């Protein structure tokens, strides 16, 4: 059948509405939803015809596509997914998972009125930042603290407050770009601070900073390169040296440590990552970091440091535009409470627990998952293998964590097709594919995920 005839054969919406099965859906759903879904189905087949992808179709085909489309339109777009990639802080999958304490706190303040900006002791308006400021000070040792909606906002607010229309001196090797084309120079531009690059990509000396200080200098800026490493012939100015230089010229020193860990991971066999506490102990005046990376909390930009600088930031007009909501505050409070005891934090904050849990634990978990799959799913090959997980989230570049995975292949379906079907399933499962095998890394899986994985694998060949 030629293309024109196929297009003429496309059913009209009024015609489809008279179909018994469509009419049944009309009784249970709004007319707008049904009509929109029918239109999408017709448009889909029109597109397939114009692309020469089909040479025939039936009204039943259009109705079946309508049913799938209707169910998709009714479901929420923001979905739970199962992360079997082994990337703990997976940026595309929502970064850090919240601790139980944080989730409970969010539910409590979300389903009730709260004292968001009300001082219960004084009986008058209060500050939303008061709910977490004392906690942040306690776990970091800072003089003062405040929170905005993400770390880019924290950097922008701090720079705007410290050196609007003045110069911020930073090493050329620290002008980083993170995901989504976010670049430190661009944030500095929007903060209205004037960028002064010093040194070279691989080597920057203290004299590079000092030689560029003038009457218009507003801040000495240090940016932790948390998502890449430069190795070999390198030189970097330490925080202590920058603090001494800042003191000599009465200039504030600001450090953006990005991933924002409160735990010294070198104690657990990892490469050292600067902690918030260590930066403050070295005398850095203002430190900015993320809430949803190594901290293991919600998306937030946390600013800690000297009270005189934080107080100025609180009064900055940008602060209101960048402020966080009650649910984020509740989640952050619940997360920070775990940090009062580091052991409790590692046990209860999923991000920390996943990163620091032992290889032996994951070997046993991988064996359990393999047994369940083998006992319930036919026509697939399953084996447990050693592999490497990643921290992710632009944190600990180059760090790989020994883990165990379940590798899957089949003579009846390709690894790429398995990946696609799992990703598009009712319970989306995100996996890795390597050398014609699907890889399920148990480091980022929960026990509750195992049954779902088994059920979705059962459907793959149907």
UniProtKB/Swiss-Prot annotation:
Keywords attached to this Swiss-Prot or TrEMBL record, sorted alphabetically, are: Cytoplasm, Protein biosynthesis, Pyridoxal phosphate, Selenium, Transferase
User: What top-level class of enzyme does the UniProt entry assign?
Assistant: transferase
Q: Which GO terms describe its biological process?
A: conversion of seryl-tRNAsec to selenocys-tRNAsec; selenocysteine incorporation
Q: Which cofactor does it need?
A: pyridoxal 5'-phosphate
Q: In which pathway does it act?
A: Aminoacyl-tRNA biosynthesis; selenocysteinyl-tRNA(Sec) biosynthesis; selenocysteinyl-tRNA(Sec) from L-seryl-tRNA(Sec) (bacterial route): step 1/1
- So what does this one do? Converts seryl-tRNA(Sec) to selenocysteinyl-tRNA(Sec) required for selenoprotein biosynthesis.
Locate the N6-(pyridoxal phosphate)lysine modifications and list their residues: 293
Cellular component, GO, one term: cytoplasm
* InterPro entries recorded: PyrdxlP-dep_Trfase (IPR015424), PyrdxlP-dep_Trfase_major (IPR015421), SelA-like (IPR018319), SelA_trans (IPR004534), SelA_trans_N_dom (IPR025862)
Name this protein carries in UniProt: L-seryl-tRNA(Sec) selenium transferase
Its catalytic activity? L-seryl-tRNA(Sec) + selenophosphate + H(+) = L-selenocysteinyl-tRNA(Sec) + phosphate
Q: Which family does it belong to?
A: Belongs to the SelA family.
Give the subcellular location.
Answer: Cytoplasm
Per the record, the major location class is cytoplasm
The record's annotation in Gene3D superfamilies points to: 3.90.1150.180, Type I PLP-dependent aspartate aminotransferase-like (Major domain) (3.40.640.10)
Q: State the source organism's domain of life.
A: Bacteria
């Amino acid at each position: 059948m030629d293309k024109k005839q196929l297009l003429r054969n496309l059913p009209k919406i009024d015609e489809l509405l008279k179909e018994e099965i469509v009419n049944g859906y009309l009784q249970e759903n709004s007319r707008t939803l049904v009509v929109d879904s029918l239109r999408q189905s017709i448009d889909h087949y029109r597109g397939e015809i114009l692309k020469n992808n089909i040479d025939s179709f039936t009204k039943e085909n259009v109705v079946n596509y309508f049913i799938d489309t209707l169910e998709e339109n009714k479901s929420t777009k923001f979905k739970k997914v199962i992360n079997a990639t082994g990337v703990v802080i997976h940026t595309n999958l929502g970064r850090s998972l919240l601790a139980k304490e944080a989730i409970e706190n969010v539910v409590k303040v979300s389903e009730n009125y709260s004292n968001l900006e009300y001082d219960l002791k004084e009986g008058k308006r209060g500050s939303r930042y008061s709910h977490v400021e004392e906690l942040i000070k306690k776990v970091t040792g800072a003089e003062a603290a405040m929170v905005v909606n993400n770390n880019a906002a924290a950097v922008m607010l701090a720079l705007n407050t410290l050196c609007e229309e003045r110069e911020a001196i930073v090493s050329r090797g620290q002008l980083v770009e993170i995901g989504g084309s976010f670049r430190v120079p661009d944030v500095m531009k929007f903060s209205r601070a004037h960028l002064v690059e010093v040194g070279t990509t691989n080597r920057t000396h203290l004299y590079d900073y000092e030689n560029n200080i003038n009457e218009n200098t507003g801040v000495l800026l240090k940016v932790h390169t948390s998502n890449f490493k430069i190795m070999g012939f390198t030189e970097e100015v330490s925080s202590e040296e920058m603090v001494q230089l800042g003191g000599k010229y009465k200039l504030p020193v600001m450090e953006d440590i990005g991933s924002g860990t409160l735990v010294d991971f070198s104690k657990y066999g990892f490469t050292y990552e600067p902690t918030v506490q260590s930066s403050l102990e070295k005398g850095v005046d203002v430190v900015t970091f993320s809430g949803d990376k190594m901290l293991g909390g919600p998306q937030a930009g946390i600013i800690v440091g000297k009270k005189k600088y934080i107080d100025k930031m609180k009064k900055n007009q940008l602060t209101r535009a960048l402020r966080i909501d009650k649910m984020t505050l509740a989640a952050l409070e619940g997360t920070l409470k775990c940090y009062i005891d580091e052991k409790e934090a590692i046990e209860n904050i999923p991000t920390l627990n996943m990163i620091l849990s032992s290889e032996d634990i994951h070997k046993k978990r991988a064996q359990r998952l393999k047994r369940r799959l083998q006992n319930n799913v036919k026509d697939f090959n399953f084996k447990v293998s050693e592999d490497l997980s990643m921290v992710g989230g632009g944190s600990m570049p180059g760090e790989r964590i020994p883990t165990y995975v379940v590798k899957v292949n089949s003579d009846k379906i390709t690894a790429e097709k398995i990946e696609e079907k799992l990703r598009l399933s009712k319970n989306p499962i995100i996996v890795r594919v390597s050398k014609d095998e699907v890889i399920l890394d148990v480091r980022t899986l929960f026990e509750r995920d195992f049954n779902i994985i088994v059920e979705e694998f059962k459907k793959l060949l149907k």
